[in-house]
Amino acid sequence: MRLISRYTHFMILLPGILMRGHQVASRPSKDYPYSSLEKQKPYFKSLGLDLSPYFNGTLNISIVPLEFEMTKPEFTFPLVEWTDLHPPETFSFSRCKVRFQGKEYTGWVYYPHPETKKTHFQNPSLIEVITYEIEGIQYGDVIDIEVNPQEITIKGYTPAP
């Protein structure tokens, strides 16, 4: 882990491991006849965040033993009514980058607020990222993530001297 300077602010670079998620963001399920992210994107676009260039799924990156907290995200969309299958949800987004096998991909930390998403437990050591499709990536792969410490607090993180 290290602090790196990018443009006008600092980013924190964290090592992570790609984990399997609930799989509702990326594919249809018995409760959802579509991927949830595919259904949510038009709502986010109408609110000012265009995610259409990105893959219709999320990377679930474990940063254990660290934990993250979305503190001052670039975007927060309160109580988005994107489906009639459950109550409205609040979502926050913070720009990020992921690195895999020497390539860098821009994207967004995607944070469905757990207080409005009662049916899913949100692991505070698992960061969900929306980015471009990454060829060849598999569960268990090492993947680095850069996050903005002005928007996301990393609990247990100590910058290198």
List the predicted regions and their residue ranges.
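N-terminal amphipathic/basic-hydrophobic helices that include classical n-h-c signal peptides
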Residues: 1-10
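Short, Lys/Arg- and Gly-enriched loop/turn segments at beta-strand edges
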Residues: 150-161
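Anionic-ligand-binding alpha/beta catalytic cores of soluble enzymes and soluble regulatory domains
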Residues: 9-86
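Loop/turn positions that initiate beta-strands
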Residues: 140-145
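Non-catalytic surface loops within mature trypsin-like serine protease
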Residues: 63-65, 113, 149
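Conserved "cap/hinge" positions at secondary-structure junctions
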Residues: 131, 147-149
